[in-house]
Amino acid sequence: MEPSFIQSAMALGLPSKKASSRNIAVERKNLLTVCRFSVKTLLEKYTAEPIDDSSEEFVNFAAILEHILSHRFKGHVSWFSTDGQRGFWDYIRIACSKVTNNCISSIENMENISSARAKGRAWIRLALMEKRLSEYIVTALRDTRTTRRFYDDGAILLREESSVLTGMLIGLSAIDFSFCLKGEGIDGKTPAVIDYTPYLKFTQSYDYLSEEDDRESVGGSSSEDSSPEHPYLPLLTDEESWYSKWRKMEQKFRIVYAQKGYLEELVRLRETQLKNLEAENKRLTQRISEQAEQSLQEKHQLEGVILELQEQLTGLLPSETAPIKQFTPSLGAPLVNQWPSLSTLNDNEAPVNPSLYRRHSFLSTEHLSAELSLSSESQRLDGKQDGEPWGPIGKDPTPSMLGLCGSLASIPSCKSLPSLKSNECLVSNSSETSPTGSPS
């Protein structure tokens, strides 16, 4: 039972899908055909006066366009919608936001229009007054991601027929529309209904009548000239046929002429924009060239400043070594006879070794302290070998400390501490006595 039931359900499901796809295709075809007829009717009706809401042709066209924009729309409940039901205005508001100088914000700020349906109808009227309805729809169709988010498969806006729709709407740019959006004329509660009767025309062909109907119509006539041979068929003469052809040609000419005027106006607008852009491009190019020249001049100036600073720097470097050379010979005299004698430090000390007073050249004070420490160590070892202490018991008067203290204590003149860091240290080997004071 179960496999047969599943097979029967699948068999019933296939025709239902085919029927639904056929219905969707028929809806698309009907809406596009009626829209084409409606646009032609508006172009024929328009003379010199603008079209407003009182025109029955416009009311029908607005209803048709609303049905096209709502075809296969995902009209689920939305939290962001004021009336709880989404309409095509939610799609237009997002997809047409990229249009330059759009009217989306103007419609959103209208106080007397609150529902999404009323805002969508106001947008249709405002776009027609701006003569930009085709531009809005073309921009919306380019945003395929947003279009697929708002419409189901099979919608007119997701099919190739959408390009046919935009081509139809171009001709409406040649018509002047005038609407009042501040009043209560825009109704957002009742749905729009399309009137198909102006576009229905039935012509019965001669082959449709059977021979029996033909005999009955002929036999039932009471008089020969009371009715024609086929009362249900209009007798078209040559003059009427030519007149109908002329009317069709006139309609086509009006449509083409309206489109031609719109395209010429569009070309003039684009030419004006192109001229403005060319002027702007020329101005920016000139500005760039001026800035390049200015930057080149600044670069040359900076290079000259750098060269001048380098010349000044090279001129200052030799003058820095000259004071050092002048300062070196002046170090000998003040330090002579300022070193304390070792004999005054200890009465039991051996005679002074003249080899201690030697002339040395040191690169820094560190070398001086190292040399003096080595000499003190050698003297200490010599003193221990002889068995005689050369200094006071309990103290370690090294020559480095003694020499430093003596020099600092006995020079009241203008010889400061940096003089000790010079390149030479002069020691006299004369036999003059040291200063009176000796360290205790």
UniProtKB/Swiss-Prot annotation:
Residues 52-184 form the RUN domain. PROSITE patterns: RUN (PS50826). Keywords: Coiled coil. Residues 262-317 form a coiled coil. CDD domains: RUN_RUNDC3A. Residues 213-233, 374-402 are annotated as: Disordered. It comes from the Eukaryota. The keyword Coiled coil applies. The keyword RNA-binding does not apply. Pfam families: RUN (PF02759). Transmembrane segments: none annotated. InterPro entries: Run_dom, Run_dom_sf, RUN_RUNDC3A, RUNDC3A_B. Belongs to the RUNDC3 family. This is RUN domain-containing protein 3A. It comes from Xenopus tropicalis (Western clawed frog).
